[in-house]
Amino acid sequence: PSSAASDVYKRQQSTRAGSKGLFALDNLWDGLGALTVIKPNVKYFFGKMTMYPSYHRQGRDMILYFLNKHFGDKDKLITPMKPLEIETDKKMLENLFCYDSFKEDYKILNTEVRKLGYNIPPLVNAYMSLSPTMRMFGTAINYGFGDVEETGILIAVNEILEDKRVRHIESFVKQHPEAMKITSGAHPILTK
């Protein structure tokens, strides 16, 4: 997650873009995977997920509540100066997302957002499935960039799920074995 994530434009995330949007996300992950090989001392990716103000308010609130429940930063390492407030009744959201399990709550989130005629934004979906220990630092409106709603996140590189690591990091090494010569070759993620 970096400002590169903002370069995956809304039209590329659209479900109407079909496989073109999926390739844009794959290219983003492949680039981040390559970065971990070339710069093996990188421990964290810090960045943001962006949602557009045109997104359904209740759908947005469900996503933000879900993210905070399952990835919220309990240590309060970072907080927005002017956090975006959820408009939907929190008790209703609490009753809706009533499971301790990410998987069970995710099924509910996906179903409820689809009932509104929307999908969970692809980048949000992608980040949630990258690491079970992702941290979410809250959301704020970026008034200088079209009033988009930006949610701060942190992902520990060594906690990226194995299937994602294989797909986006190890695949880079197979295609570019010379990249391991840039470092000692003892990559902390690949030798995990």
Predicted regions, residues:
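Single conserved hydrophobic/aromatic residue that forms the stacking wall/gate
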Residues: 1-9
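A short, internal acetyl-CoA/4′-phosphopantetheine-binding micro-motif in the GNAT/acyltransferase core
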Residues: 10-20
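C-terminal accessory regions appended to core domains
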Residues: 116-123, 128-142, 148-155
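Conserved GNAT acetyl-CoA-binding A-motif
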Residues: 36-50
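Non-catalytic substrate-recognition and accessory regions of acyl/acetyltransferase enzymes
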Residues: 6-7, 149-192
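A conserved mid-domain beta-alpha-beta active-site/ligand-binding segment of alpha/beta enzyme cores
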Residues: 73-124
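Conserved acetyl-CoA-binding loop-helix of GNAT-fold acetyltransferases
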Residues: 18-35
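Conserved beta-strand-loop-alpha-helix junction that forms the acyl-donor binding cleft
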Residues: 15, 46-56, 115
